[in-house]
Amino acid sequence: RDSVASRGLGDVYKRQMETCEAAAARGIRIGAHVAYRDLPGFGRRRMDYAHRELRAETVYQIGALSACARAVGTEVSYVKPHGALYNRIAVDENQAAAVVEALLLARSTCGDELAIMAQPGSVIERLSLDADLPVIREAFADRAYNSDGTLVSRVLEGSVIVEPDAVVKRVIAMASGEPIVAYDGSPLTVQADSICLHGDTPGAVELSRMIRQGLVDAGVTVAAHV
């Protein structure tokens, strides 16, 4: 599975086409990685959008990627919000509702099975389930968690976990239903269907191989969820 950046900035459309072509050739399912239109901040800065504006922006980003995917014989299977938008809709009713409405509208081009990838226990998960949207619960291999299940802010030391053994052990624990250690030292159980590893985490490619092998060795079946 491959989440493809969907923000209409720079040479993103060329990259979208190239990524969709590569994914189609390898049988990899495609997800739209929608985000705030924030190139300088890489989509990681909090932004305030009016409800209808965010809904329209999200529909546009999904639609643009969907056109690229269909042009090469595949489709967008799921949507994973990025960065600050992902964190905001975990707790913000208005912005979460705008994203849910956008996915319902995007079904006209992507199909009724279009899924949302979301944090377990979040506002966006609840609203998506209420709207009968398929939900893929997501856990993070390389990010620290607060005790309430939200992600630790990237401005704090230790918010990104890069030590390979620690990452692999966390992922195995989450996949097995065992608790991990939250940022404040308390135990936290994260129920998830999918594991996220950020591409800009140091050593991400090799780390992904280690995670997969660790899961296989632990008896966990690794497969695309959608």
What would you call each of these model-derived segments?
Residues 6-7, 40-55, 89-92, 110, ...:
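Glycine-rich tight-turn/loop motif centered on a GG-T
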Residues 33, 79, 197:
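Conserved, mostly hydrophobic/aromatic
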Residues 92-100:
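Charged helix-capping and loop-helix junction motifs
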Residues 39-72, 78:
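Glycine/small-residue-rich loop that forms an oxyanion/phosphate-binding "nest" at active or ligand-binding sites
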Residues 206-226:
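C-terminal domain-boundary segment and adjacent tail
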Residues 18-31, 70-72:
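Acidic (Asp/Glu)-rich catalytic clusters
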